[in-house]
């Protein structure tokens, strides 16, 4: 199966003189439809790596390959915005939904931004909201939803443009374990059907074990593990 997303020798450092390394020569390839779990302690660089992968932060060196398009520190903001809108989906622990918009309006938004008509965006949003079991809450304000329902809206919004890959940063971190597994199963089911890859940063080992493989980040360095590899539960 073809690679749809890759990080090549990503290095990121902070500090006045860039003397504090956060990501050290990270290389990762993700195939179409593959789910990769990114685990590591708080402060290990998971969120920084996802921000770089999502073209929201620029690496000190290295490149990102998305749909056979190479992105480096020389890639323009305009090109990055285009790639984000057309090829990437994002889910965060704190969902960044628009509180003043309804469920339906939140999910329609990515399609409107990428040029779809309101009628098409509404049709597609209603279809995907049915898939995440929110068809009876289309006009409800976000503020009236439960935590699990809000994350289902976030999942629907991340998937509506059928991205190549969804970058999920602790997407169920604020939910209890049963709700987290239920919400992630909805994401996993739709992604599998549409062959969408997922890079999942999580502290939840129950979720991590649903991935195709595990990548651990430790002091900015990536190490890969298979799901059934001896000692995984000790990572």
Swiss-Prot record:
Subcellular location per the Swiss-Prot or TrEMBL entry: Cell inner membrane
Family annotation (SUPFAM superfamilies): P-loop containing nucleoside triphosphate hydrolases (SSF52540)
EC numbers: 7.6.2.-
Keyword NAD: no
Superkingdom of this protein's organism: Bacteria
Annotated binding of ATP, by residue: 40-47
Membrane topology according to the record: Peripheral membrane protein
Domain called ABC transporter: residue spans: 5-235
SMART domains for this protein: AAA
A Gene Ontology molecular function term of the record: ATP binding
Keywords: ATP-binding, Cell inner membrane, Cell membrane, Membrane, Nucleotide-binding, Translocase, Transport
Gene Ontology cellular-component annotations: plasma membrane
Keyword Membrane: yes
Primary location class: membrane
Family: Belongs to the ABC transporter superfamily. Lipoprotein translocase (TC 3.A.1.125) family.
Function of the molecule: Part of the ABC transporter complex LolCDE involved in the translocation of mature outer membrane-directed lipoproteins, from the inner membrane to the periplasmic chaperone, LolA. Responsible for the formation of the LolA-lipoprotein complex in an ATP-dependent manner.
Assembly and oligomerization: The complex is composed of two ATP-binding proteins (LolD) and two transmembrane proteins (LolC and LolE).
Official protein name in the record: Lipoprotein-releasing system ATP-binding protein LolD
Gene behind this protein: lolD
């Amino acid at each position: 199966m073809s690679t749809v997303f890759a990080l090549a020798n990503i290095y990121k450092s902070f500090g006045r003189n860039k003397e504090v390394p956060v990501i050290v020569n990270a290389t990762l390839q993700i195939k179409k439809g593959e789910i990769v779990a990114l685990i590591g302690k708080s402060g290990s660089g998971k969120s920084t790596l996802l921000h770089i992968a999502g073209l929201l932060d620029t690496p000190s060196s290295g490149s990102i390959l998305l749909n056979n398009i190479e992105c480096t520190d020389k890639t323009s903001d305009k090109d990055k915005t285009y790639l984000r809108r057309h090829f990437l989906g994002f889910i965060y622990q704190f969902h960044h939904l628009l509180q003043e918009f309804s469920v339906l309006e939140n999910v329609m938004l990515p399609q409107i931004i990428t040029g779809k008509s309101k009628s098409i965006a509404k049709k597609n949003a209603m279809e995907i909201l049915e898939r995440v079991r929110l068809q009876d809450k289309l006009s409800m304000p976000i503020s009236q939803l439960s935590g699990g329902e809000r994350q289902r809206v976030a999942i629907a919004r991340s998937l509506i443009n059928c991205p190549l890959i969804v970058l999920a940063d602790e997407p169920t971190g604020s939910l209890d374990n049963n709700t987290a597994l239920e919400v992630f199963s909805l994401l996993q089911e739709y992604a599998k059907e549409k062959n969408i890859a997922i890079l999942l940063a999580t502290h939840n080992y129950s979720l991590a074990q649903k991935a195709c493989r595990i990548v651990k980040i430790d002091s900015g360095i990536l190490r890969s593990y298979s799901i059934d590899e001896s000692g995984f539960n000790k990572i």
